[in-house]
Amino acid sequence: SSFLEMLDILNEQLIHEGMDPVAVEKGCQSSGPVSFDHDCREGICGACSLYINGRAHGPDDEVTTCQLHMRKFHDGDTITIEPWRSKGFPVIKDLVVDRQAFDKILQAGGFISVGTGGVPDGNAILISHETAEESMDGAACIGCGACVATCKNGSAMLFVAARVSSLALLPQGKIEGAKRAKAMVAKMDELGFGACTNTRAC
């Protein structure tokens, strides 16, 4: 079963046994089943963000929590589950954090506002395959926040860089490139994310 299915089973067990998770884990703010965030359960939306045994999304590389399976753990293993830890992602309840900060960063500049022509123009502007692929690499970021959770400074610079580069590499995005980057970095700083010091933990 998947890691999130395990959490579903745990919650069902807590409800069935009438247990209060507050008594299970001192300091927990919940008085019912353990709250955790999820949506697609297919590794697309990034909502299932958890810190598992000291790693963002757990022991597997390049997967989200919902893609993690319990076969990665052994019987009797102690599994420590924590929410993302960053000033930019305040805890709402249990394992759920508020990731609206990423939306606010995108609202600051993650778009193209200049006229880019009509529908036919989209096919008339030639873009090399290499440029399109590089732009798609940035667009592949699902905004889960693992880069922030892993960074000792709580920096969102990798997220911002992915969004800026996915647009700036395309001809339509070059016009506002500098303005976009400055606005998004300023919003990131305003929201309390740390600075990048090139530790490459992300």
Q: Language-model segments: what does each one mean?
A:
Residues 43-49:
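A short, compositionally biased
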Residues 34-42:
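Serine/threonine-rich, repeat-prone extracellular segments and beta-strand-based repeat modules
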Residues 29-35, 48:
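Glycine-/proline-rich flexible loop or hinge segments
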Residues 2-29, 77-202:
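Ferredoxin-type iron-sulfur electron-transfer modules in oxidoreductases and energy-metabolism complexes
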Residues 17-21, 33-35, 59-60:
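Short secondary-structure capping/junction motifs at helix and strand boundaries
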Residues 52-75:
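S4-like RNA-binding module at protein N-termini
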